[in-house]
C-alpha cells in the first residue's frame, strides 16, 4: 500500500482559531453579589491578575471613572464591499451595532464577538443619520434625498415619509417621551413631527445656511441646532420660536449634543477647531473651550459618566475629555485610531465598548484598558507601526501576524515582572501622556504604562 496515499486518506487535524469576545455578564454577577452583602468594590492594583477585579461601568459612575475610558483597540470590522460609513448606532440592549453605509445599506455586527450578522438594503441613497427612541421600540433613519423611514427592532419598515425636506437630512432626535421627533436638513430649516401619525407640527426657521446638527433635551422642552452659518440656536418646540442664539463659533457648527444623563450641559464642536461646553444652569456660561490644530468632526457623550465625552478628529485621532478632571485639554488621546477622518462615534448603552467609523471604510471597537497591559502603548493605534493585517495583531494570539517588539508582544520577563502590591492607590490623578514606555529602573516599572487606566 502506498504510504503517501494512506497519509492523504487520514483527516488532518484542524486547529481552532481564537476570536476575541467581550462579555460583562460575569462582572455584573459579582457586582450584584457585592451589593447584596454590603461589600465594597475590590481594589485594582498594577498587576495583571487584578483584571478580574474590574467591575461593570455602572460601578464607576463617579469614583474611579477613569476606569471606564475605552482606550484599548479590540477589533476591526469592514464589509466585503466597502463604502464610507456616515452613521452607526447601537441597539437599545447593546447586543448589536447597526452600521449605515453610503450605498444605503444596513449591516449588523455582533456586539460581543464582533462577527458579521446580516446586511439589507434600507435606502435608495446614502443613509446620513439613525436614532433609536428612548424606549427602544423604534428606529428612525434619514437619507440624502430627504426621506425618513421608521423601523421596528426587527428591521421591519412600518412607515416612510418621502422627501419631507428638499435637501438631505443631517440629523434626527426624539423627544423625551418619544411622542415627537425633530429633523434638520441642508434646506436651512428644522421640522417637528408627530410620531403617532407622521404629521408635521412645526417648522423652525431662523438659520441662514445648512443645519448640520440637532438634539432634543432629555428632560426639558428644548431643542438645540447647529448650522453652517456659525450659529447655535435653542428652540421652544411648543411655539417654534428661537429662545437663544450662541455666537461663540467662527465657522460651521458640526455637532451639538445635550448631556444625556442629566441634561445640564451642552457640548458643541465646530470647524474653527474648537470644542465648547456650555452650562444650561448658568445662562449658557461657557464651561470649557478647547482648541486644536485639526478639526473636530464627531462628538459623543458617555452613556454612563456624566462628565466624560469623546471627540473624533479629521486626522483620525480620538480624544477623551473629562470635565471633572481637566477642562483645558483631553485626558487621553489615541493618535492613530483611524487612517482618515472619523465620521461616526457610538457608545454602547452598557458603557464598556466604544465603536467608531471613519472614511477609511472600517468600524473599530474600543474597550476599557487592563492593569499592566504589556501591549498598551505598543499597539499600532498609538505608535502607527501598521503593516498588512496589523489589526489581527498580538491580541488574537495564535494567528498573530504582527512582528513582536521588545515590550509589546509578550509579558515582561520574570526579572522585570511587576510585583504585587498590598495597598490600593487612591491617588488617581490623570491619564499619562501618550508615549511609548521605556522602563529603565525598578521604580519606573512600577508606574502605570497602559492607556486609560492610571493606576
Swiss-Prot record:
GO terms for cellular component: chromatin; mRNA cleavage and polyadenylation specificity factor complex. Keywords: Chromosome partition, mRNA processing, Nucleus, Repeat, WD repeat. It is found in: Nucleus. Transmembrane segments: none annotated. Residues 406-425, 430-455 are annotated as: Disordered. InterPro entries: G-protein_beta_WD-40_rep (IPR020472), Pfs2-like (IPR045245), WD40/YVTN_repeat-like_dom_sf (IPR015943), WD40_repeat_dom_sf (IPR036322), WD40_rpt (IPR001680). One of its GO terms (biological process) is chromosome segregation. Its main location: nucleus. Residues 432-446 have a biased composition (Basic and acidic residues). Coiled coil: none annotated. WD repeats lie at residues 80-119, 122-162, 164-203, 206-245, 248-288, 291-331, 337-376. CDD domains: WD40 (cd00200). Required for 3'-end cleavage and polyadenylation of pre-mRNAs. Also involved in chromosome segregation where it has a role in chromosome attachment to the mitotic spindle. PANTHER family: PRE-MRNA 3' END PROCESSING PROTEIN WDR33 (PTHR22836:SF0), WD40 REPEAT PROTEIN (PTHR22836). This is Polyadenylation factor subunit 2. It comes from Candida glabrata (strain ATCC 2001 / BCRC 20586 / JCM 3761 / NBRC 0622 / NRRL Y-65 / CBS 138) (Yeast). The lineage of its organism: Eukaryota, Fungi, Dikarya, Ascomycota, Saccharomycotina. The gene is PFS2.
Amino acid at each position: 500500500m502506498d504510504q503517501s496515499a494512506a497519509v492523504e486518506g487520514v483527516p488532518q487535524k484542524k486547529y481552532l482559531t481564537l476570536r476575541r469576545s467581550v462579555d460583562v455578564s460575569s462582572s455584573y454577577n459579582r457586582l450584584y453579589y457585592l451589593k447584596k452583602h454590603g461589600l465594597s468594590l475590590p481594589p485594582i492594583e498594577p498587576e495583571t491578575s487584578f483584571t478580574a477585579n474590574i467591575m461593570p461601568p455602572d460601578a464607576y459612575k463617579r469614583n474611579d471613572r477613569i476606569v471606564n475610558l475605552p482606550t484599548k483597540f479590540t477589533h476591526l470590522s469592514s464589509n466585503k464591499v466597502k463604502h464610507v460609513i456616515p452613521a452607526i448606532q447601537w441597539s437599545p440592549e447593546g447586543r448589536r451595532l447597526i452600521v449605515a453605509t453610503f450605498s444605503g445599506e444596513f449591516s449588523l455586527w455582533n456586539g460581543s464577538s464582533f462577527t458579521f450578522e446580516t446586511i439589507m438594503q434600507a435606502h435608495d441613497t446614502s443613509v446620513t443619520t439613525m436614532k433609536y427612541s428612548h424606549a427602544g421600540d423604534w428606529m428612525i433613519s434619514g437619507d440624502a434625498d430627504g426621506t425618513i423611514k421608521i423601523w421596528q427592532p426587527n428591521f421591519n419598515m412600518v412607515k416612510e415619509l418621502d422627501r419631507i425636506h428638499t435637501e438631505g437630512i443631517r440629523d434626527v432626535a426624539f423627544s423625551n417621551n418619544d411622542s415627537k421627533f425633530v429633523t434638520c436638513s441642508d434646506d436651512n430649516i428644522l421640522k417637528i413631527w408627530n410620531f403617532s401619525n407622521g404629521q408635521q407640527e412645526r417648522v423652525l426657521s431662523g438659520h441662514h445656511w445648512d443645519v448640520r446638527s440637532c438634539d432634543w433635551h432629555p428632560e426639558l422642552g428644548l431643542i438645540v441646532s447647529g448650522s453652517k452659518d456659525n450659529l447655535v440656536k435653542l428652540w421652544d418646540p411648543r411655539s417654534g420660536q428661537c429662545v437663544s442664539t450662541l455666537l461663540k463659533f467662527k465657522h460651521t457648527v458640526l455637532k451639538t449634543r445635550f448631556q444625556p444623563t442629566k441634561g445640564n450641559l451642552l457640548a458643541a464642536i465646530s470647524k474653527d477647531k474648537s470644542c465648547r461646553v456650555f452650562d444650561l444652569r448658568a445662562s449658557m456660561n461657557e464651561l470649557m473651550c478647547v482648541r486644536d490644530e485639526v478639526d473636530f468632526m464627531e462628538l459623543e457623550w458617555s452613556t454612563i459618566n456624566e462628565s466624560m465625552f469623546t471627540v473624533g478628529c479629521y486626522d483620525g485621532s480620538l480624544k477623551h475629555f473629562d470635565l471633572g478632571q481637566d477642562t483645558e485639554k483631553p485626558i487621553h488621546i489615541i493618535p492613530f485610531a483611524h487612517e482618515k477622518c472619523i465620521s461616526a462615534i457610538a457608545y454602547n448603552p452598557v458603557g464598556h465598548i466604544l465603536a467608531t467609523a471613519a472614511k477609511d471604510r472600517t468600524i473599530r471597537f474600543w474597550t476599557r484598558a487592563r492593569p499592566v497591559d504589556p501591549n498598551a502603548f505598543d499597539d499600532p493605534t498609538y505608535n502607527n507601526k501598521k503593516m498588512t493585517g496589523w489589526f489581527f495583531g498580538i491580541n488574537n494570539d495564535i494567528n498573530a501576524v504582527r512582528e513582536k517588539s521588545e515590550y509589546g508582544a509578550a509579558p515582561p520577563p520574570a526579572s522585570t515582572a511587576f510585583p504585587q502590591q498590598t495597598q490600593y492607590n487612591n491617588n488617581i490623578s490623570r491619564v499619562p501622556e501618550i508615549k511609548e514606555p521605556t522602563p529603565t529602573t525598578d521604580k519606573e516599572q512600577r508606574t502605570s504604562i497602559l492607556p486609560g487606566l492610571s493606576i
